[in-house]
């Protein structure tokens, strides 16, 4: 990444993610955006942008926001610690009253909601098991997963998920070097290096799912596993659970084992540990590379990117809601 901290990656899609890791100004001149700071003025043609992730103090002109809204391009904002702050969510053009009504029905109806909540946890658990199997780690996820069908409330389902994830992190620790072991899961703030990467990665994935939901007819605030509170896109939290093992956890393990991320890529405080600018850039570059990575889809019979898998998951949910096909969560097959 250059000194401006503006990284543009992505080999599969014409439009790219742009990651801004330094302070600056985003302004518009006709159909081109410019990222400006004290060191440079970088043009970003609007037809090259898929989404923007800002990790610095970013000032945006109203003209730039109008153009981004017109083109349906979201911006996700993170604070200096890498925690998600919010998103600029463009005017929605794919809204469907019928889909929104069906979404609401599946929240109000207890049986329909619990069915979906269980599906999200089952998908997450099976992907965790795939990660552990990939590294040859014995695990008891299948045993705990048996408790899912007898869970009769969302709270019970969340408790099963919490037990599975705790056992999962303990199992991952068995293959990590001592300095990178997770130990206790700590979040705000994370207290060690791997906790820092998990928190950073989960926030990043959450915003990626928000972008994919924007490109569907789903309302991102209506959710099933996580409570649909105000001021958050809780459906993105639901779908993120399924993809955390695939996109975030495997990537973190790989970065550690290949020594691509080292102790000097973190800043340590009295009670916290966070990725520094060097660490953020390495993490973002690898994340974007993986989003563009493709796998042969077993049902479609063609290669699709990891990013596309997220969108396809949203489409599967829509089919379930409108009664076309029962939802089956994504599970890694490779």
Swiss-Prot record:
One of its GO terms (biological process) is maintenance of CRISPR repeat elements. One of its GO terms (molecular function) is metal ion binding. Keywords: Antiviral defense, DNA-binding, Endonuclease, Hydrolase, Magnesium, Manganese, Metal-binding, Nuclease. Its cofactor is Mg(2+); Mn(2+). It comes from the Archaea. Its EC number is 3.1.-.-. Mn(2+) binds at residues 161, 226, 241. Coiled coil: none annotated. CRISPR (clustered regularly interspaced short palindromic repeat), is an adaptive immune system that provides protection against mobile genetic elements (viruses, transposable elements and conjugative plasmids). CRISPR clusters contain spacers, sequences complementary to antecedent mobile elements, and target invading nucleic acids. CRISPR clusters are transcribed and processed into CRISPR RNA (crRNA). Acts as a dsDNA endonuclease. Involved in the integration of spacer DNA into the CRISPR cassette. Homodimer, forms a heterotetramer with a Cas2 homodimer. Belongs to the CRISPR-associated endonuclease Cas1 family. This is CRISPR-associated endonuclease Cas1.
């Amino acid at each position: 990444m250059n000194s401006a901290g503006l990284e543009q990656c992505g080999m599969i899609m014409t439009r790219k993610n742009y990651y801004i890791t330094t302070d600056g100004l985003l302004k518009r001149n006709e159909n081109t955006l410019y990222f400006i700071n004290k060191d440079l003025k970088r043009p970003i043609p609007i037809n090259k942008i898929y989404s923007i992730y800002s990790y610095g103090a970013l000032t945006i002109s109203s003209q730039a926001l109008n153009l981004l809204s017109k083109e349906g391009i979201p911006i996700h904002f993170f604070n200096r610690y890498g925690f998600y702050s919010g998103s600029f969510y463009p005017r929605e053009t794919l809204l469907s009253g019928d889909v929104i009504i069906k979404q609401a029905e599946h929240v109000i109806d207890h049986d329909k909601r619990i069915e979906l909540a269980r599906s999200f946890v089952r998908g997450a658990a099976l992907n965790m098991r795939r990660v552990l199997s990939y590294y040859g780690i014995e695990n008891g996820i299948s045993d705990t997963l048996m408790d899912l069908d007898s869970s009769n409330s969302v709270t019970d389902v969340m408790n099963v998920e919490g037990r599975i994830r705790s056992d999962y992190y303990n199992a991952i620790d068995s293959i990590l070097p001592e300095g990178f072991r997770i130990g206790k899961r700590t979040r705000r703030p994370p207290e060690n290096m791997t906790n820092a990467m998990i928190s950073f990665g989960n926030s990043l994935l959450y915003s990626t799912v928000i972008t994919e939901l924007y490109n569907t007819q789903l309302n991102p605030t209506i959710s099933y596993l996580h409570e649909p509170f105000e001021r958050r896109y809780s459906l993105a939290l639901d779908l993120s659970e399924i993809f955390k093992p695939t996109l975030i956890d495997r990537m973190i393990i790989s970065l550690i084992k290949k020594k691509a991320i080292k102790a000097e890529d973190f800043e340590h405080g009295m009670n916290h540990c966070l990725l520094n600018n060097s660490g953020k850039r390495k993490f973002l570059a690898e994340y974007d590379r993986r989003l563009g990575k493709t796998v042969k889809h077993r049902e479609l019979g063609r290669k699709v990117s990891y990013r596309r898998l997220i969108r396809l998951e949203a489409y599967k949910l829509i089919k379930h809601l409108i009664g076309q096909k029962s939802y089956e969560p994504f599970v890694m097959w490779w």
